[in-house]
């Protein structure tokens, strides 16, 4: 099983390097890191400040303009550059809590045949305020579950909730369903 990670980026920085480093230590290896960068000049300016060899060897960078960027279309373009079985889309500021993130996501994806997507919990920052902590704990409970149409009466709109901060998709099902809606203006 091949796993690619697609990362939409605007204004790369040290947090992106930290993400690259953490993804390089996952127990499930990343085949390719596919960065969908907004504004080539920002990437070039940042890359010039790095030590030679600092960027991962499995990194591919594709550029879009600010006008072309869209939360759905940019992820679609990144997934189109992939030939992996699993595509993990994550934001550049989402840092794995441990080395088992990709294993947990892929285990969830392949635990049942008809599962198409699995998303990660967002943990509250240690120094966050009480409202942010409650929001994270409410939206991302510590128990995993499979959601189905039959859960609609119980979960309501939460039945369809999926975080775009860090989610893994079976590429074959994703493509069969047509990918993300274009002109996605929320994150």
Question: Where on the chain are the PLM-derived regions?
Answer:
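Short aromatic/hydrophobic "clamp" motif used to bind/position activated sugar donors
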Residues: 87
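Conserved donor NDP-sugar-binding/catalytic core segment of glycosyltransferases
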Residues: 100-132
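Acidic donor-binding segment of Leloir-type glycosyltransferases
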Residues: 23-63
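A recurrent flexible, glycine/aromatic-enriched loop bordering the glycosyltransferase active site
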Residues: 150-169, 184-187
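Conserved nucleotide-sugar donor-binding
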Residues: 83-84, 163-177
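Short, well-formed alpha-helical segments that are part of the catalytic scaffolds
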Residues: 12-25
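Glycine-rich, basic loop-to-helix element that forms the pyrophosphate-binding segment
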Residues: 65-82
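Cell-envelope/extracellular polymer assembly enzymes that use nucleotide-activated donors
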Residues: 2-4
């Amino acid at each position: 099983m091949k796993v690619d990670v697609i990362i939409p980026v605007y204004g790369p920085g040290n947090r992106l390097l930290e993400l690259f480093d953490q993804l390089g230590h996952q127990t499930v290896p990343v085949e390719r890191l596919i960065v969908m960068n907004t504004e080539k000049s920002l990437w070039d300016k940042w890359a010039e400040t790095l030590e030679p060899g600092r960027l991962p060897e499995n990194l591919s960078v594709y550029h879009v303009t600010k006008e072309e960027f869209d939360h759905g279309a940019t992820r679609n373009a990144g997934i189109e550059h992939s030939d992996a079985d699993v595509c993990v889309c994550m934001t550049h500021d989402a840092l794995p809590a441990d080395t088992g993130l990709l294993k947990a996501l892929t285990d969830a994806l392949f635990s049942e045949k008809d599962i198409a997507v699995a998303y990660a919990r967002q943990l509250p920052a240690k120094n966050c305020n009480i409202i942010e902590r409650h929001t994270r704990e409410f939206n991302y409970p510590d128990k995993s579950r499979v959601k189905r149409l039959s859960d609609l009466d119980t979960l309501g709109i939460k039945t369809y909730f999926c975080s775009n901060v860090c989610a893994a998709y079976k590429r074959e099902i994703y493509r069969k369903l047509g990918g993300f809606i274009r002109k996605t203006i929320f994150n």
